[in-house]
Amino acid sequence: MNKDTIFSAPIEKLGDFTFDESVAEVFPDMIQRSVPGYSNIITAIGMLAQRFVTEGSQVYDLGCSRGAGILSIRRNLQTNQVKIIGVDNSQPMVERCRSHINAYHSEVPVEILCDDIRHIEIKNASMVVLNFTLQFLPRADRLELLTKIYQGLNPNGILVLSEKFTFENQVMNELLIDLHHTFKRANGYSELEVSQKRTALENVMLTDSIETHKDRLKQAGFSQIELWFQCFNFGSMIAVK
């Protein structure tokens, strides 16, 4: 696993964070050291696939990055009669995802598309995953995407929505942000790395509160919604049609 050192030296002109070649190269290390509970979420996505994915249906991983979620799903399926569709708009991520998926033999077909997730038709889906993806979309586009997902899910289909959260109570919000930064420092990131990455992300990752997410999911059509995992200001929700 290549180590993330992208923000380790001072960057004079710090632009917005993008999922480019340099990020794709170190992404597994970056996300493990940056997102508390990430491996637990990936493992649980496989468990949820085992329970919810049905024969003859499709599974979508929207914002699939290098394919960790897809591999977890595929390992846990009860049937081979399923198609998994992964979508990411970063070509470097897609290339590595395809290579990663092809390294493990399976009878389950997987298609990896380089596209904007807002352009993808969702149909005959028993499971859709948005793993730390929605927060990178403009807020104005989020409800439309979730509504499309709801409409494309079969009855009893599941959406897994993992996000970084903001909290309306400012004291708690600052505490959880600080704990997250402590987590990153404990994983070997310097103050400079934490600071520069935060600055690079502030215009492209727009976080919402848990309440906002629940309200939006209800507007999209879901009625069964629950937060099933949280560590500091990161977590994951499930919504069942």
Swiss-Prot record:
As given in the record, the signal peptide range reads none
Reading the lineage from the top rank, the first entry is Bacteria
Q: What reactions does this protein catalyze? A: prephenate + S-adenosyl-L-methionine = carboxy-S-adenosyl-L-methionine + 3-phenylpyruvate + H2O
UniProt keywords, alphabetically: S-adenosyl-L-methionine, Transferase
Listed binding positions for S-adenosyl-L-methionine are: Y38, G63, C64, S65, D88, N89, D116, I117, N131, R198
Q: Which CDD domains match?
A: AdoMet_MTases
What is a single Pfam family found in this protein's UniProt entry?
Methyltransf_25
- Say if the entry is tagged with keyword S-adenosyl-L-methionine: yes
Q: What is its EC number?
A: 2.1.3.-
List the GO molecular function terms.
carboxyl- or carbamoyltransferase activity; S-adenosyl-L-methionine binding
Biological function:
Catalyzes the conversion of S-adenosyl-L-methionine (SAM) to carboxy-S-adenosyl-L-methionine (Cx-SAM).
Which NCBIfam families does this one have?
A: carboxy-S-adenosyl-L-methionine synthase CmoA (TIGR00740), PRK15451.1 (NF011995)
- State the family it belongs to: Belongs to the class I-like SAM-binding methyltransferase superfamily. Cx-SAM synthase family.
- Subunit record text: Homodimer.
| Name of the protein described by the UniProt record | Carboxy-S-adenosyl-L-methionine synthase
- What is the species of this protein? Actinobacillus pleuropneumoniae serotype 5b (strain L20)
